[in-house]
UniProtKB/Swiss-Prot annotation:
Keywords: ATP-binding, Cytoplasm, Nucleotide-binding, Nucleus, Proteasome. The 26S proteasome is involved in the ATP-dependent degradation of ubiquitinated proteins. The regulatory (or ATPase) complex confers ATP dependency and substrate specificity to the 26S complex. Its main location: cytoplasm. It comes from the Eukaryota. InterPro entries: 26S_Proteasome_ATPase, AAA+_ATPase, AAA_lid_3, ATPase_AAA_core, ATPase_AAA_CS, NA-bd_OB-fold, P-loop_NTPase, PRS7-like_OB. GO terms for biological process: proteasome-mediated ubiquitin-dependent protein catabolic process. It is found in: Cytoplasm; Nucleus. ATP binds at residues 209-216. Belongs to the AAA ATPase family. This is 26S proteasome regulatory subunit 7A. PROSITE patterns: AAA. GO terms for molecular function: ATP binding; ATP hydrolysis activity; proteasome-activating activity. One of its GO terms (cellular component) is proteasome regulatory particle, base subcomplex.
Length: 426
């Protein structure tokens, strides 16, 4: 029997070295018809990039700075001395507007008034009477227009990060969501429908109902959905120590809102400042009433409101002033009532969506055991059921945990519920 070729190779003690022809043959493996041209172009690109970096003076460093040999500290210092900081002034009057010889009266605070001209970088159409401007310190020429001065506490009310709450997270409020979307989203997405009919879209919504029914939650969902600027104001923030401070904050708030393309202003717990006017003989609530009157004026006063939607939430609508509630200021009143059986079942499913629960839990049965309960009560039931599971050192929540939680929260905490008191007043 003849030995196999593989056995011959294994048995060779002195393998034959590769000659030049074999090496040349190995180098041709994996090469295509354009390999030589591609290598040539790649080499030219590397050389060109190296030449560009040498001309620009950029080293391969973390900072990307030019080498010290190319630094020109004298010219940099001269440039810094020429660009002096500007001084803030206010343009009080324009003399001979819309002409080449237009002059501007500016008032520099704590110094004097000056009649000045425009700098080289400013267009005459950019300057209006009453606006803040930046002027140089030598000739007091107007160099740049400045935005209006707004209190930082008002600027901080803008919601920068969108909340993570969507309409799917608001259970038992199907009708309320539709009404809210008609007021907020429809005029922004389809304004042509209102133009064709010749009507103005509704601009204000009052959300009222018992505590814990989802008024603020729905406002957070609106902020998540819309691309407009969302400003959140808590009623007690506008109650200030000094006379006129609250009204000034309201004016600056709506001034900032008008500067946006589209804006939604949400007043939470509006009964803190929107109470009905009365005379208690002491005058303690006069400042709060002035703040409320400023809101009334901004909502529908002499000046147009613009594309500003106003949402208000309260659980005491009976205490609000009638001037605040009239159509034109708040066009719609949306009541957030207690959820029905279907709504309570949906709320249970929403809150248990992220929980480790058994599969065969009867949420409809749990909803039947929670009559006249709000969404906040049901959330408390789910949290308490998780506490029962933690206490028993289990990793999943059973139906018995939910039943025990219902017995504890719904029945045990009944005396703390604010819903019956709300029903009495409203």
């Amino acid at each position: 029997m003849a030995p196999e070729p593989e056995d011959d190779i294994m048995n060779e003690k002195n393998p034959r070295p590769l000659d030049e022809d074999d090496i040349a043959l190995l180098k041709t493996y994996g090469l295509g018809p354009y390999s030589t041209s591609i290598k040539k172009v790649e080499k030219e690109i590397k050389e060109m990039a190296k030449k560009i970096n040498d001309l620009c003076g950029i080293k391969e460093s973390d900072t990307g700075l030019a080498p010290p040999s190319q630094w020109d500290l004298v010219s940099d210092k001269q440039m810094m001395q020429e660009e002096q900081p500007l001084q803030v002034a206010r343009c009080t009057k324009i003399i001979s507007p819309n002409t080449d010889d237009a002059k501007y009266v500016i008032n520099v605070k704590q110094i004097a008034k000056f009649v000045v001209g425009l700098g080289d970088k400013v267009s005459p159409t950019d300057i209006e009477e009453g606006m803040r401007v930046g002027v140089d310190r030598n000739k007091y020429q107007i160099q740049i227009p400045l935005p209006p001065k707004i209190d930082p506490s008002v600027t901080m009310m803008t919601v920068e990060e969108k909340p993570d709450v969507t309409y799917n997270d608001v259970g038992g409020c199907k009708e309320q969501i539709e009404k809210m979307r008609e007021v907020v989203e429809l005029p922004m997405l389809h304004p042509e429908k209102f133009v064709k009919l010749g009507i103005d879209p509704p601009k204000g919504v009052l959300c009222y109902g018992p505590p814990g029914t989802g008024k603020t939650l729905l406002a957070r969902a609106v902020a998540n959905r819309t691309d407009a600027c969302f400003i959140r104001v808590i009623g007690s923030e506008l109650v200030q120590k000094y006379v006129g401070e609250g009204a000034r904050m309201v004016r600056e708030l709506f001034q900032m809102a008008r500067s946006k393309k589209a804006c939604i202003v949400f007043f939470d717990e509006v009964d803190a400042i929107g109470g009905a006017r009365f005379d208690d003989g002491v005058g303690g609530d006069n400042e709060v009433q002035r703040t409320m009157l400023e809101i009334v004026n901004q909502l529908d006063g002499f000046d147009a409101r613009g594309n500003i939607k106003v949402l208000m939430a309260t659980n005491r609508p009976d205490t609000l002033d009638p001037a605040l509630l009239r159509p034109g200021r708040l066009d719609r009143k949306v009541e957030f009532g207690l959820p029905d059986l279907e709504g309570r079942t949906q709320i249970f499913k929403i809150h248990t969506r992220t929980m480790n629960c058994e599969r065969d839990i009867r949420f409809e049965l749990l909803a039947r055991l929670c009559p006249n309960s709000t969404g906040a009560d049901i959330r408390s039931v789910c949290t308490e059921a998780g506490m029962y599971a933690i206490r028993a050192r289990r990793k999943t929540v059973t139906e018995k945990d939910f039943l025990d939680a219902v017995n504890k929260v719904i029945k045990g905490y009944q005396k703390f519920s604010a819903t019956p008191k709300y029903m009495v007043y409203n």
